[in-house]
UniProtKB/Swiss-Prot annotation:
CDD domains: homeodomain (cd00086). Belongs to the Antp homeobox family. The keyword Repeat does not apply. Its main location: nucleus. This is Homeobox protein Hox-A7.
Length: 209
């Protein structure tokens, strides 16, 4: 065998490979698929660029496992239907969050006294007054046991209290004052009887004789 035989055989192999991998042609933006051709991601149904039609159609690039191949519809994303569902999803999200908020157990929330209901069944706490407020109310009560509406408003603004608080304080103070004076009046007759007891004098002794 001559050397020309080996050269020709080697050259024939390269030519066969060249047909399998053709030289890429210069591509342009016009040869790329447009948006209508790329409607589905990974679908593989759109046309290929003009530069590589024979490359992907070669038997080397065929799926060696036809039993495990996926149809184009299995991974095809319909963008149009997804875009139509976006408003529906956005409308359902606030409702879902609101429903989840109402269904949360009360143990996750801390209830403060001011958050409780103010209905008739509510147990009212005892109103506390500062030392300054108590002193001013006592001074006013010393001069006036009953307040007019105008005076009550003035005191409420001066002490940063409500008219209802002023009214209740004076009612309680009058009850306390009456109770104290009633106790004093109950004790006073006993002392008066002792002081008004009859005493024997020298003239009475003479009359008895």
């Amino acid at each position: 065998m001559t050397s020309s035989y080996y050269v020709s055989a080697l050259f024939s192999k390269f030519t066969a490979g060249a047909s399998l991998f053709p030289n890429p042609e210069p591509t342009s933006c016009s040869s790329l698929p447009n948006n209508s051709q790329r409607g589905a991601y990974g679908s593989g149904t759109g046309p290929f660029p003009s530069s590589v039609p024979s490359l992907y159609s070669s038997p080397l690039y065929q799926n060696p496992f036809p039993g495990y191949s996926l149809a184009s519809d299995s991974y095809n994303l319909h963008c149009s239907s997804f875009d139509q569902n976006i408003p529906l999803l956005c409308n359902e999200l606030p409702k879902a969050d609101e429903a989840a908020l109402h269904h949360q157990p009360d143990s996750h929330f801390r209830i403060y006294p001011w958050m409780r209901s103010s209905g008739p069944d509510r147990k009212r706490g005892r109103q506390t007054y500062t030392r300054y407020q108590t002193l001013e109310l006592e001074k006013e009560f010393h001069f006036n046991r009953y307040l007019t509406r105008r005076r009550r408003i003035e005191i409420a603004h001066a002490l940063c209290l409500t008219e209802r608080q002023i009214k209740i304080w004076f009612q309680n103070r009058r009850m306390k004052w009456k109770k104290e004076h009633k106790e004093e009046s109950d004790q006073t007759p006993d002392a008066g009887e002792e002081s008004t007891a009859p005493t024997t004098t020298a003239d009475d002794d003479k009359d008895k004789e």
